[in-house]
Amino acid sequence: MAHQTGIHATEELKEFFAKARAGSVRLIKVVIEDEQLVLGASQEPVGRWDQDYDRAVLPLLDAQQPCYLLYRLDSQNAQGFEWLFLAWSPDNSPVRLKMLYAATRATVKKEFGGGHIKDELFGTVKDDLSFAGYQKHLSSCAAPAPLTSAERELQQIRINEVKTEISVESKHQTLQGLAFPLQPEAQRALQQLKQKMVNYIQMKLDLERETIELVHTEPTDVAQLPSRVPRDAARYHFFLYKHTHEGDPLESVVFIYSMPGYKCSIKERMLYSSCKSRLLDSVEQDFHLEIAKKIEIGDGAELTAEFLYDEVHPKQHAFKQAFAKPKGPGGKRGHKRLIRGPGENGDDS
């Protein structure tokens, strides 16, 4: 399988970044095209930064397409002019695009130069990234106040970006709900599974590029399934389980998350665990694959035919009580009385 490279800025965009940092540009729009960061648009300053803001920013916010905007302020620090970083992810854009732009956000800041960025905003509607929205953001930073939905999402994205500094103590706050984007080959494999063109998919996380990539789609039956599970690395597996239940032939998609315990680093274990739920959401919602059973294992040897069948069709442990004679009334009972019939006592009366 040919592994795709991560998303980075083109040479033309890098050159434009260098030119813009000198102060001749007010606004830069960056978009993702053909797995690369490219220049989408730019504008020169007309007036002060606050006068230029809305007329420069708002027309560039597409209702369907995420993007990044870098907006130059008039203030300077030791490295030169200060900039705002605006991440636009409209509600109407496809989920896969949102995930791709969220995962690439840190790369854009790194390519531009994080030391030049004074502040950043995240927006899902235009009001979030308007000049008034920026003023509200500054006010919320200055005083403790409830965060807007956009600010909460930005806060979660910032938390996710810290995932490279993982410790046992920080795992719950840094790794909730990570969404690594599926590489195109992995997406195609899921579509093929939906069409039953393949019956097995194995995926892994690329921790450097922050993506979910396809390992292989080798044809696999139940007997071969245990041998597909690596003993020294975590994996996600999707298996089309063909079997018979109560006389009916069935085909059930089973998701298997294999994690060989402490043979994997803490970082790897936590990233796989955190990305799992968002991956399954995408598989069920975007690819319309119904997952019959979700299984977690530590060793491939667990995947026997009996184990799979019992997981997909759990046994109903109904308690059946044997028939017993009804008990008599509770409490103490008197002595038995012997009632003799006529003539039984020897009398002829």
Curated annotation (Swiss-Prot):
Q: Which residues carry this modification: N6-acetyllysine?
A: 14
Acetylation as a keyword of this entry, yes or no, is yes
Single annotated GO MF: ATP binding
**Where in the body, by tissue, does this protein show up?**
Ubiquitously expressed (at protein level).
Q: Where in the cell is it found?
A: Cytoplasm, Cytoskeleton; Cytoplasm, Perinuclear region; Cell projection, Stereocilium
- Record-listed Phosphotyrosine modification sites: 309
What protein name applies here? Answer: Twinfilin-2
